[in-house]
């Protein structure tokens, strides 16, 4: 398969090197377009008010891989690859392997998930891979699973356009509890901002915060609760696969809102 790989940790991150090299090793045609520096938590931002530069990078990846380092965001990287750098469209867009999990509502901030989301915006099935640790450099389990999942999709293509958000526990292979199909959970934080004072007496804020245990979800969910959330399944050391889509319409509430009789609203 022809595969485009990106990330938000940057061109020098071990996660993307492990993923790209692992896929090339089993015969896939791999292209890498990723940020030239750390771009974590940039969400789906695009660069609009300055030029985007992309340079071919050698010696970082397997010789079979063509790679570019891009000055833009993760979403920029995928968009630039699809419309300017690659001669033909890839079969899959992959993002990762991220250094740290992307679970629950944190996915809205994730540059990794957003890079993969840009793939399905352009009608290409996508996968985001994340390792459940910010410090671990053991990517072998994650790479092995990525190889297996890509092989599965190659032999049995997804029946609908979707993004698979995959999180792998940062534990030994023997400690993995299994693989679960999950729904998106909820992550909440306390003490989100630290208020500090600089040497000149000016107040500034540093985004910090402590993750709470998974909190209660919004009621009246359309998704069956027989599926574990990604947050709880990862806590139990399962590899999680959560299908995502870019359409955020709350479908079940369309009929309810129609009862508002909005024709009677004033707008002048």
Swiss-Prot record:
Its EC number is 3.1.3.5. The keyword DNA damage does not apply. A divalent metal cation binds at residues 8-9, 40, 98. GO terms for cellular component: cytoplasm. It is found in: Cytoplasm. The keyword Iron does not apply. This is 5'-nucleotidase SurE. It comes from Trichodesmium erythraeum (strain IMS101). Its main location: cytoplasm. Nucleotidase that shows phosphatase activity on nucleoside 5'-monophosphates. It catalyses: a ribonucleoside 5'-phosphate + H2O = a ribonucleoside + phosphate. Gene3D superfamilies: Survival protein SurE-like phosphatase/nucleotidase. Keywords: Cytoplasm, Hydrolase, Metal-binding, Nucleotide-binding. Belongs to the SurE nucleotidase family. Its cofactor is a divalent metal cation. InterPro entries: SurE, SurE-like_Pase/nucleotidase, SurE-like_sf. It is an enzyme of class 3 (hydrolase). GO terms for molecular function: 3'-nucleotidase activity; 5'-nucleotidase activity; exopolyphosphatase activity; metal ion binding; nucleotide binding. Pfam families: SurE (PF01975). Binds 1 divalent metal cation per subunit.
């Amino acid at each position: 398969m022809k595969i485009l790989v990106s990330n938000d940790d940057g061109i020098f991150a071990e996660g993307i090197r492990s993923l790209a090299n692992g896929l090339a090793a089993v015969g896939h045609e791999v292209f890498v377009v990723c940020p030239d520096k750390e771009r974590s938590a940039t969400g789906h931002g695009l660069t609009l008010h300055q030029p985007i530069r992309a340079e071919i990078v050698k010696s970082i990846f397997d010789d079979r891989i063509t790679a570019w380092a891009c000055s833009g965001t993760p979403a920029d990287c995928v968009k630039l690859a699809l419309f300017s750098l690659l001669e033909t469209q890839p079969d899959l867009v992959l993002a990762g392997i991220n250094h740290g999990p992307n679970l629950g509502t944190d996915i809205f901030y994730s540059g990794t998930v957003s890079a993969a989301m840009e793939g399905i915006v352009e009608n290409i099935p996508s996968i985001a891979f994340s390792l459940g640790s910010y410090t671990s450099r053991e990517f072998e389990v994650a790479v092995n699973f990525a190889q297996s999942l890509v092989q599965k999709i190659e032999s049995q293509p997804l029946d609908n356009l979707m993004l698979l958000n995959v999180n792998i526990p940062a534990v030994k292979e023997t400690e993995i509890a299994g693989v679960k199909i999950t729904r998106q959970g909820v992550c909440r934080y306390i003490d989100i901002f630290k208020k500090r004072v600089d040497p000149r007496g000016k107040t500034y804020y540093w985004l910090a915060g402590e993750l709470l245990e998974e909190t209660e979800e919004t009621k009246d969910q359309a998704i069956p609760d027989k599926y574990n959330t990604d947050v709880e399944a990862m806590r139990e050391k399962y590899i999680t696969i959560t299908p995502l889509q870019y359409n955020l319409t709350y479908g079940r509430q369309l009929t309810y809102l129609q009862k508002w009789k909005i024709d009677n609203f004033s707008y002048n």
